[in-house]
Amino acid sequence: MEGFLLPLVIHPRVRKTIGRVAAMTCVAVFASAGAAYAACPAQTTTTPFAQWGDHSSYFLVPGGSFEGTESQVGWNLDNAELTAGNEPFYVHGRSDDQSLTIDGGGTAASPVFCADATMPDFRFFAREDSPGGDLKVEGVIQTPYGPYTATVATIADGSMPSWAPTAQLKIPSIPTGWRIPVSLRFVVSGGGSWQVDDVYVDPYRAG
């Protein structure tokens, strides 16, 4: 059960802040996007965290297994790269053999995907490859006026020396009935480096 007990620094203002912004701007920002007021399309789901007691269904973030070339994976990488070696639990597939390494000062942003109020949680696998920096996780909401970024959690330097699943992290709040384009961004502060693999979103968990 150690995957649920990682020493994360969670930012509780995220849901309240994004909720206020969304409430004030959703109509103005998204009303012109005809399909904004609707649920996201159904996704193929699995139960990748069942062995840690989490039997919820999750879908893989686009490119979130980090298998293939950088162009096939589609993530925006800066001082980060696809590297050999998968997380050791092989929750996405036994043939997987790659993960993402982010060096100090580097960033990695997922492709934009559709998110709605039924998708508040996400999880992934991580380990600190070399010490010296925190791993910050951000939710980036895309709007016609530019991206809105909120820090979701910070995984502290030294807290994950070996591969493990993270706790359930919160995607910034989305008003019921709306869908928005969002991406997840990982930032390594300071020195050191982190590995990330198999990034999943839970489309069903309530609250």
Describe each PLM feature range.
Residues M1-T17:
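N-terminal secretory signal peptides that target proteins for export/translocation
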Residues V27-A36:
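C-terminal segment of classical bacterial N-terminal signal peptides
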Residues A50-G53, F59-Q98:
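Extracellular glycan-recognition surfaces and repeat-rich motifs
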Residues G190-G207:
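Exposed low-complexity, polar/acidic, P/S/T/G-rich flexible segments that act as propeptides
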Residues W52, P144-I180, V187-Q195:
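Extracellular carbohydrate recognition and processing domains
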